[in-house]
Amino acid sequence: MNYTIKDILKLEVAPALGCTEPTAIALGAAAAATLLFPGKAIETIEVWLDPNLFKNGLAVSIPRTHGRSGLDLAAALGALAGDAHLKMEVLTPITDKDVDAALALVAGKQVKVRLLDRHRGLLVRTRIKAGDQIAESVIEQLHDNITSLCLNGEQIETTDLFPRSLEGGKNQTSALELWLRGITMETMIAMIDDLDGSDLEFLQTGIDMNMALARHGLENAVGLGVGTTLEALAQKGLVARDMIHRARVLTAAAADARMSGAPLPAMSSAGSGNHGLTAILPVKAVADHLKSDRKDLCRAVGLSHVVTAFVKAHTGRLAAICACSVAAGAGATAAITWLLGGTPGQIGGAVENIIEDLAGVICDGAKNSCALKLDTAAARAVQAALFAMNGLTVKVTDGIVGGSAEETIRNMGILSSQGMIETDKTILKIMMDKLINSRSEQ
């Protein structure tokens, strides 16, 4: 089966409120809670997580909680007041009263989160006990892919919470990723010619959504404050106000806002809100600098989403490698090079530039300092494009660089999925040791 760019946008690009890892935990709990009798008091919540989801959700702020974080809090919020039908916007209905109730569950040690340290691949398994009822849910492979619901041990066969599937029962996104791994850069570039009016409107909505986060970050000085600091440095004349600076400011400020738990959705890309910020905002900054028209901006962002999905199909959904840098960064690079008038060869060369530059950036979980990495990715995306447009591209003799952009991306996928397994374990161990030490000091 061949896919269109409309299919890719439908499956890979969607609004997400808050970091996608605690949101996935909340979604799993909310889905299980739909099986309980209304008004039934929750006694216990148990959640089992894969290592990468555990790592990514450990320290990031949860929307509508006034800056609070915690895997257990995310589960409690989802179970008590989340709307599972909203998928990655599951926490939209949360109120201060719900937060207080969730905190009470956590304080009463009624929520247990366990690490499945040997599991590979995304997994959220949730069990909620309420009186004589036990409700269970499973999310696998993708953050919103609910694959199982059980009540008192009996499998629920039909529900609108289950994803639609293709023939043979294969999940649509899994099938798409398999297809993506076999296409070329030329195919991806050609896809944007098929964007219709509704696609362009959807892409513009994503641009507007992520720009709102950037404005929130700049106006409220939230999170680590990377965006506001970059802006202050420019005001002092210490750094230049060019399109690289603008790309950095917009992307970092949006990350500041999102990682601090701002109550605003991000338009995600390939399953991640931060990917969406990186895939969209540097492109917007360059388009503004070039005075590109709205249609070209939206077409470029469409290309960015496709390339981001292509890279993620090789690296996997969650890994030790920072995919904001190499996947969404590659998407933004391709889009920027296209806006600059680049040929398919120059676009591929630019993508290879950024991958060779940032392939070693690790993911040490979602948290405020992600803004630093998104700042770097935005800057390098513009630089990689400008380098390629001026004849500078890395060579096949260099490290993991292959004979084409596609081969280089495949090599990076091998690095991510095979070469960084122990790195991932070490990162998580350091984070867990910190958590244990901080608790022992309290």
UniProtKB/Swiss-Prot annotation:
GO BP: any one term: L-cysteine catabolic process to pyruvate
Pfam families: SDH_alpha (PF03313)
Classification via InterPro entries: Ser_deHydtase-like_asu (IPR005130), UPF0597 (IPR021144)
Coiled-coil ranges (or none): none
Molecular functions (GO terms): L-cysteine desulfhydrase activity
Family (UniProt): Belongs to the UPF0597 family.
Protein name from the UniProt record: UPF0597 protein HRM2_02820
Organism: Desulforapulum autotrophicum (strain ATCC 43914 / DSM 3382 / VKM B-1955 / HRM2) (Desulfobacterium autotrophicum)
